[in-house]
Amino acid sequence: MKEITRKSWENMINLSLDEPFFLYLETPLCGTCKMGKRMLEVALETINTQKDRNVQVGICNINEMPELAEKYGITSVPCLLILSRGIAVKRVYALQSAGNIYQTMIKSLEKEV
């Protein structure tokens, strides 16, 4: 997972032109965000290992880039934002489990195949 900054944001958007790009939005003091991030790490590792993929996930502190919340209609954190061709196609707020995140990511990736 890669930390997203204003400088790296445009490069990350370009990644979504070829396949879905996953952006995890959080704040540093959010306990639920920390748990969600760990579940996302497990799901990502499983996808990249079992499916032989190199799925990219960005992480963004929404306090440092509030314009993303406005642009993509983010109402709370944690949020897993799924971008395809630069457009938000899904927002996931209830990160219930690593398995749930895994299924959400796999479904998004399969739509692009």
Question: Predicted segments — roles?
Answer:
Residues S76, L81-V113:
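Non-catalytic, surface beta->alpha helical segment in thiol-disulfide oxidoreductase systems
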Residues N14-L17, E45-D52, E112-V113:
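Alpha-helix termini
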Residues C30-C33, L80:
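The canonical Cys-X-X-Cys-His
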Residues M1-D18:
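Short, charged low-complexity linear segments at domain edges
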Residues S16-P28:
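Short active-site neighborhood of thiol/selenol oxidoreductases, capturing the structured segment around
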Residues I62-L80, S84:
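Mid-chain, well-packed structural core segment of small domains
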Residues E3-R6, L25, L44, N48-E67:
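Thiol-based oxidoreductase modules, predominantly thioredoxin-like and allied folds used
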Residues K34-N48:
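Typically the conserved alpha-helix immediately C-terminal to a functionally engaged Cys/Sec
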